[in-house]
From Swiss-Prot:
Species this protein is from: Bos taurus
Described function: Deposition-and-exchange histone chaperone specific for H2AZ1, specifically chaperones H2AZ1 and deposits it into nucleosomes. As component of the SRCAP complex, mediates the ATP-dependent exchange of histone H2AZ1/H2B dimers for nucleosomal H2A/H2B, leading to transcriptional regulation of selected genes by chromatin remodeling.
Compositionally biased residues, Acidic residues: 40-75
GO BP annotation list: positive regulation of double-strand break repair via homologous recombination; regulation of cell cycle; somatic stem cell population maintenance; transcription initiation-coupled chromatin remodeling
Gene Ontology CC entries for this record: NuA4 histone acetyltransferase complex; nuclear speck; nucleosome; nucleus; protein-containing complex
Record-given protein name: Vacuolar protein sorting-associated protein 72 homolog
Region described as Disordered: 1-164, 335-357
Skewed-composition ranges (Pro residues): 341-351
């Protein structure tokens, strides 16, 4: 518990408060804002000898919408007595409201003309409306208005009547020559700037040394070339059904779009780099692809007697029948004596195997 709350109050507490309030200076805010909050002196009681022009109010604002206008003025006195005196503020010694002074008709007309020239903020309509404009703001507005008026007057004097005479042909040619020189200088400057800009463009840097380029594309698929067809004349084999079947298959089949495949190309800039990555060795022999002379298919077997490759059993039978007909017509070949009794065969040449002794029979 604090000491101030526990001790007894002083007997002299508040004696100097009234003196401080009397010495307190009046604040300018309460005198200027909204026309002032202080009451006028001598307004406590109604004074009948005062002129009616001081409190004269327009009839449109004095009469309510629901009330009828009264001609005897009975409601004037109670309305004035209804004001409440504010005790929080000290009444000033003199009234802040300037009293109207009667002026002649000539001066009033001159005043109206001056008000028409002033802005709306500085015009005083003569009514009892209290404005909230400070003195400094009013002075600043007045000076601004005077500066605007002076600027407008100077512009009017400068804009006086001015007529330009038409130029002669000699003057036009002289002006065109000056313009041409200016354009040429501007063009030279522009070309020089463009040349400097081109010099500053970075050139494409080339990589020194060997380069390996990798490029992958899609190309149409090209079939491998097939073996050359051999005409085989075999009795008992009718080629008409095969030809008709192939023609029917080619005519009725759907149109297939060409197939595509992927191809990858690796390019070397020089031969040394290529040989470094792919050293040259012994070239392997590519095996010869043998084809059956009857079916024109890759041969999977070989006839041990005639040494002719074949693909199916039917082709083997056709080859043997052709071999029998050849023997019947021409007899056994010279090398066929090795199969039966007779003189021994000649010695094989060096480097030749058993297959070198066989003679390939060509079937026509």
């Amino acid at each position: 518990m604090s000491l101030a709350g526990g001790r007894a109050p002083r007997k002299t507490a508040g004696n100097r408060l009234s003196g401080l309030l009397e010495k307190e200076e009046e604040d300018e805010f309460y005198q200027t804002t909204y026309g002032g909050f202080t009451e006028e002196s001598g307004d406590d009681e109604y004074q009948g000898d005062q002129s009616d022009t001081e409190d004269e109010v327009d009839s449109d604002f004095d009469i309510d919408e629901g009330d009828e206008p009264s001609s005897d003025g009975e409601a004037e006195e109670p309305r004035r007595k209804r004001r409440v005196v504010t005790k929080a503020y000290k009444e000033p010694l003199k009234s802040l409201r300037p009293r109207k002074v009667s002026t002649p008709a000539g001066s009033s007309q001159k005043t109206r003309e001056e008000k028409a020239l002033l802005p709306l903020e500085l015009q005083d309509d003569g009514t009892d409306s209290r404005k909230s404009m400070r003195q400094s703001t009013a002075e600043h507005t007045r000076q601004t208005f005077l500066r605007v008026q002076e600027r407008q007057g100077q512009s009017r004097r400068r804009k006086g009547p001015h007529c330009e005479r038409p130029l002669t042909q000699e003057e036009l040619l002289r002006e065109a020559k000056i313009t041409e020189e200016l354009n040429l200088r501007s063009l030279e400057t522009y070309e020089r700037l463009e040349a400097d800009k081109k010099k500053q463009v970075h050139k494409k840097r080339k990589c020194p040394g060997p380069i390996i380029t990798y490029h992958s594309v899609t190309v149409p698929l090209v079939g491998e070339p097939g073996p050359k067809e051999e005409n085989v004349d075999v009795e008992g084999l009718d080629p008409a059904p095969m030809a008709s079947a192939l023609a029917a298959r080619a005519g009725t089949g759907p149109v297939i779009p060409p197939a595509r495949c992927s191809r990858t190309f690796i390019t070397f800039s020089d031969d040394a780099t290529f040989e470094e990555w792919f050293p040259q060795g012994r070239t392997p022999k590519i095996p010869v692809r043998e084809v059956c002379p009857v079916t024109h298919r890759p041969a999977l077997y070989r006839d041990p007697v005639t040494d002719i490759p074949y693909a199916t059993a039917r082709a083997f039978k056709i080859i043997r029948e052709a071999y029998k007909k050849y023997i019947t017509a021409h007899g056994l070949p010279p090398t066929a004596s090795a199969l039966g009794p007779g003189p021994p065969p000649p010695e094989p040449l060096p480097g030749s195997g058993p297959r070198a002794l066989r003679q390939k029979i060509v079937i026509k």
